[in-house]
């Protein structure tokens, strides 16, 4: 398509599976995400979900609403203390999550990220491990990688079978990363303790969801991190990216940095921004 007047696409958020990055590059269009703006609200939401899962907040809430006070001893919880967090993807959200959990007395966090060096992870206080070790070792597995051809279906039946029986899976990234059929089976058969899901393979979810009947699952309509501050910050970050381009600077969070080496883009940049 003719994109002679289009210089940039700013993606509100950090997931970019809906952006055809290669097509942007071919059309001499720079694409960028609002890197950093979503880190804290998503990380805070994950902390809340970790506590809600391990303390059986949903189940206990339902007990009281249903007049089942005497059944409370069925739901003995566990603390975050001495537990292990494993993150899949060690980007900004995962780093903020680790930072927020620093005072909770948890074990050293571990991460699976093939794009991160051991030295860089060590500076963050994180130990890099393989995916299988992370799944076997973690009490909480939190997904923070983008949905790509490489990560689609990354967590399937085989991977879920590696998790601890008292482990929890949290997905605030993209639904396609997790095989939902395999996850449902693992949850209903109590092969893992629970899950929290903010995203699904097919969205929007407008029909009753099968996970909704499970008391060991927390759900949100891809909005668990939506706050006033989030939308303020992603708007500011997107606008700042456009200002950076206008002032002949590269914005943060560029998805196709190679576009800056293309003669067509450079000429367009000069024509539009002077």
Predicted regions mapped to residue ranges:
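Rossmann-fold NAD(P) dinucleotide-binding segment
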Residues: 1-7, 20-23, 150-169, 180-184
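Oxidoreductase and adenylate-handling cofactor-binding alpha/beta cores
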Residues: 43-62, 83, 102-107, 236-249
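Phosphate/diphosphate ligand-binding glycine-rich loop within oxidoreductases
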Residues: 1-63, 77
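Short glycine-/small-residue-rich Rossmann-like dinucleotide-binding loops
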Residues: 14, 139, 145-147, 173-174, ...
């Amino acid at each position: 398509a003719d994109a002679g007047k289009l210089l940039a696409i700013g993606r509100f958020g950090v997931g970019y599976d809906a952006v055809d990055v290669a097509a942007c590059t071919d059309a001499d269009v720079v694409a960028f995400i609002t890197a950093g703006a979503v880190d804290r609200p998503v990380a805070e939401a994950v902390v809340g979900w970790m506590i809600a899962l391990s303390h059986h907040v949903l189940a206990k809430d339902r007990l009281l609403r249903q007049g089942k006070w005497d059944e409370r001893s069925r739901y003995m919880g566990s603390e975050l203390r001495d537990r292990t967090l494993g993150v899949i993807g060690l980007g900004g959200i995962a780093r903020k999550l680790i930072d927020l959990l620093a005072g909770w007395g948890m074990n050293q966090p571990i991460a699976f990220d093939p794009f991160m060096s051991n030295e860089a992870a060590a500076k963050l206080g994180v130990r890099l491990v393989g995916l299988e070790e992370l799944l076997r070792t973690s009490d909480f597995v939190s997904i923070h990688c983008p949905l790509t051809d490489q990560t689609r279906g990354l967590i399937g039946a085989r991977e879920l079978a590696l998790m601890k029986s008292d482990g929890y899976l949290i997905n605030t990234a993209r639904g396609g990363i997790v095989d939902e059929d395999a996850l449902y089976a693992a949850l209903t058969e109590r092969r893992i303790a629970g899950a929290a899901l903010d995203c699904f393979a097919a969205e929007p979810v407008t029909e009753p969801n099968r996970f909704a009947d499970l008391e060991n699952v927390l759900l949100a309509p891809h909005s668990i991190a939506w706050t006033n501050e989030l939308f303020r910050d992603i708007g500011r970050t997107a606008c700042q990216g456009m200002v950076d381009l206008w002032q002949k600077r590269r914005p943060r969070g560029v998805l196709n940095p190679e576009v800056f080496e293309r003669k067509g883009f450079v000429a367009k940049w000069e024509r539009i921004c002077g």
